Amino acid sequence: MRKLGLLLMTILLGSFCQAQSRMEAGIFLDSLSISQTSTNNFGLGARFGYRVHHDVMFEGELAYDYGINFDEGYRNITTGNITALERTSIGVTHGLFGPTLERGAGHFHPFATLKAGFVDFRLSPSLLPQSNLASVILGLRTSNVNAALYAAAGISATLGPVGLRLEAGDEIYFNNGARHNLRIAFGPILRF
């Protein structure tokens, strides 16, 4: 009985340790250029991945971009002319999940990824109560949580279990059509 218990423990711990070498975690600095507001938002994020195949990793990530001020224009709904400007703050939270194709061996790992998720825009409240004005970014004000698709490529360099990762891609959110936005992320990773 004791030998059977030791054998089962060895098998379970061995498979657990093997599974641990298939994971990756990291934090990153994030830059997102929002096309509708022409702002460059910066923030922090974290990512976790699990390797399901030698060259395929499923990753989930969440990033919080701090608020940036910009001038929001308001159009007169009868004439179509911009009649007011207001200083507005916009912040972004985005979460994405999907596969990453990455060469697993060696010290340099080029990769490509396609992820889906959400983009949540945090806009400061509007101070203009006039009923004949409409914001030029009305779609973001009425629907601040939007579906997103992210296609990117990059490279990671590792030395043992630690490394650095750089990626750039197009984060597309859907708000009255597809909106393309450049996104760049850079930060340390840990493989275990």
Protein language model features and the residues they cover:
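Gram-negative (and chloroplast) outer-membrane scaffold detector with strong preference
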Residues: 49-131, 160-161, 174, 184, ...
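Transmembrane beta-barrel strands of outer-membrane/channel proteins
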Residues: 27-31, 60-64, 112-118, 155, ...
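Short glycine/proline- and aromatic-enriched beta-strand/turn motifs that initiate or cap beta-hairpins
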Residues: 18-54, 58, 116, 185, ...
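Extracellular loop and loop/strand-boundary signature of outer-membrane beta-barrel proteins
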Residues: 31-34, 80-87, 135-141, 171-175
